Amino acid sequence: MSNSNIDNDPAKIDSLLRKAKSKKIPVTYDDINKALPLNKNPSIRQLEEAILKFSDAGVDILESNEDDEIKLDIGIDEEFKLSTNVDNESEDEVEEENIGSTDDPVRLYLKDMGGVDLLTRENEVEIAKRIEEGRKTMTASLCRSPVAMRCFIVWYEDLVNEKMLLRDLIDLEANMLHDEVHENDEEHNSETEVEEHEDNHLSMSRVETQILHNIIDRMKKISFICEELLIEAKKCYEESFDPKVLQNSRKYNNNLELLIHEVSEIHFNSKRTEEILGKMYGINRDLINKETAFLKLAEKYGVTRQNFLDEYIGSVINAAWKEKMLKNKKVAWKELITKESDYIDQMINELSVIESNTGLLVNDFKKLVNTIQKSERQTLQAKKDMIEANLRLVISIAKKYANRGLQFLDLIQEGNIGLMKAVDKFEYRRGYKFSTYATWWIRQAITRAIADQARTIRIPVHMIETINKILRTSRQMLNELGYEPTATEIANRLSMPLDKVRKVMKIAKEPISLENPVGDDSDGGQLGDFIEDKNAVAPIDAAIQSNLREVTTRVLATLTPREERVLRMRFGIGMNTDHTLEEVGQQFKVTRERIRQIESKALRKLQHPIRSKKLNSFRNGGKRGDGNPSDLLEA
């Protein structure tokens, strides 16, 4: 039988077949069905062909997956068979489903994650060395750039003049937590961590104060070295314009090595590094645009792309180069230089400005940028490898914090952010396994996210610390006393004012949604249905008002139309507002006195017992002497 239909998606079928044969386990019809193309409804013929393929290979096919343990492992370690359901699904249900395709983002994430092998200690060290090598190359390259040197000088001046905060210059967190990670894989109390993690946050300003003078001294030294290097580089280029002279200068090289060492000792904020890279990449883009435009112009005159690159790349584009190209044997070059002389002169001037701004020849600057970009790619790839291999660790930690106010996927996301920070700050020479080191960072990121985002109404960090202290004491006293302690007992235990304890306990209450269902059945309604709306009109008041309108209309109907109209306008009955005698008189084209007379006559008629009896029940705000509202409805 032809397998042409299966060939539409052979990878999944073959992968399933290989795993079943290698592990000598049967597959189910569901496994085969899931391995068929997802974007098409598999036909009976396709399914039959797939079944035949497995039968020919000697793989048993079951009706259903009766044995939960017969699964095709996709590489997720037994230690990390994790829950993907916040509603406390069993861990066995969360293991990846038999290679089958799915459009569930969580399962796709777990599937991709499971396809990456775990790292050994040697693998971690190897990746860490790649990251370190990439950073060293980038640091050395940046320190060779006068653009970076000028930035270092400006940063030092801003720091001294208090125009820049220390936390905006360096990575305070890296300095603060430099010695806080210990080789300790024991279980942590996640609840206690959420309560106490903010102590580190509160000490950030203290750390900033402690290391400020040390950083200023180091930046002062860096600034001085940069000034020396810039002066020597400027002198060299003005005299000889030969980069080899500078490269062979012992003084310059000694200062450069010293600068690289000093800069490497400072954990600069990522924004500061991006600032330097942004400037250099911007200049490089400008250069590429100019060179591209020059290439297109040369091609119009018949200069081939390869010939252009041979003559342009590696050459110093100046007046001497222009004269040299005029003597070129190729006619196309001579024609280009002759007819586009002004354009080339302008380009030479622009390149000269760039060389002046960067402090390097164009070719040297391009090589430097290329080295930086290469080291950046190397570092990013190494970080990516380390992160992807440790995603299981994030999930294993995140599941311990489920039902703490954040969705499980949000916990994973925050944990991944902590994992990325751990990769940035991992120091393999300390001898820790990366998982031990990363666990602290992942927990820190998750607990901070819970404290900041879990509550609908955000509470300040210092208040969260007080709340957690009181709740912790309350639980301890509950275990000791056997009953819920009062606010007074908690205040005495903590030596805290009673008013403050009551205030904190009130703040600690979680908000409740008005849409929470009441009762077990769907007809129980929502919590908001049982809360009184102070602004709403009570049903009895609405009925009285409606009855008053009807009675008033009937009573006014016993008057003449003119009298009814005058009373309605004067007292605003059935209108938006009342009217003055002058306004009513203008409507009827009579004097104010005549309107007053009509009004008086109409009011006397209403005072007649036959009419007034119907309205007396509504006097005194709608309450009769006996206070029975039903009398008003019967009026």
UniProtKB/Swiss-Prot annotation:
Biological process (GO), any one: DNA-templated transcription initiation
UniProt cross-references to SUPFAM superfamilies, sorted A to Z: Sigma2 domain of RNA polymerase sigma factors, Sigma3 and sigma4 domains of RNA polymerase sigma factors
Region of interest (Sigma-70 factor domain-2), residue spans: 386-456
GO cellular component, one term: cytoplasm
Record's keyword annotation contains Transcription: yes
Subcellular location: Cytoplasm
Pfam hit, one: Sigma70_r4
MF terms in GO: DNA binding; sigma factor activity
Basic and acidic residues composition-biased segments: 182-191
DNA-binding region per UniProt: 581-600
Keyword terms: Cytoplasm, DNA-binding, Sigma factor, Transcription, Transcription regulation
Family membership: Belongs to the sigma-70 factor family. RpoD/SigA subfamily.
Protein name: RNA polymerase sigma factor RpoD
Native organism: Rickettsia typhi (strain ATCC VR-144 / Wilmington)
